[in-house]
Amino acid sequence: MAKKILTAAPLIDALLLQNLVVGDAKSLRAHESYSGERFAVSDVGGQDLSGASFSECEFVEMEANETNFRAATFVETHFGRLTAPIFIAPRSNFRDVSIEGSRLGSAEFYESTWKSVRFSHCRIGYLNLRGAHLRDVLFDDCVIDELDLGAATANRVSFTNTQVDTLDLTRSVLTNVDLRSLEVRHLTGVEHLKGATINSHQLAELAPFLANHLGIVLNE
């Protein structure tokens, strides 16, 4: 009997933030470091916060349209009800981060590094993770129009009760990526599914894509 292969789940610790001091979002500056602050009901739209570093911080009801978070670092940080039609954070670093109840239009995270990151109850238009390095990431109860994982490296990434209209896996490298609770309508890069776990229903839905890739003619 063949040995059953188990899919490793993301390792995500609970985020506990205590004794935070009230921070002033308008005073945030690029390449500065911030720790133990809570920023509530703030609008940082259009600000340059590139290279900034945040540790043990919380952002609640923040408007961040076209805010430049390029190469910023977030460690043990929580985002609640974040809103941004355009969210700019390429080459950023997220570690032990929770993003909850947020709405993002175009979210640019390409070439970023994520470790122990949880998205829950979020609505995202285009999530660009091309060339990103993802480890221990969970998407829970999210709706994503387009998820671009082209050339990304993903290990222990899971989706629960999540819908993605278009998923691009072109040249991605997957390990322990659990897609069983993910509803996908369109898939690009089916040849790069190695390392993903799917269920029998999903396999049947993928049959036309697999047949096309392998040059198999389906004819009843």
Language model features: what each stretch is:
Residues 2-220:
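Tandem repeat scaffolds
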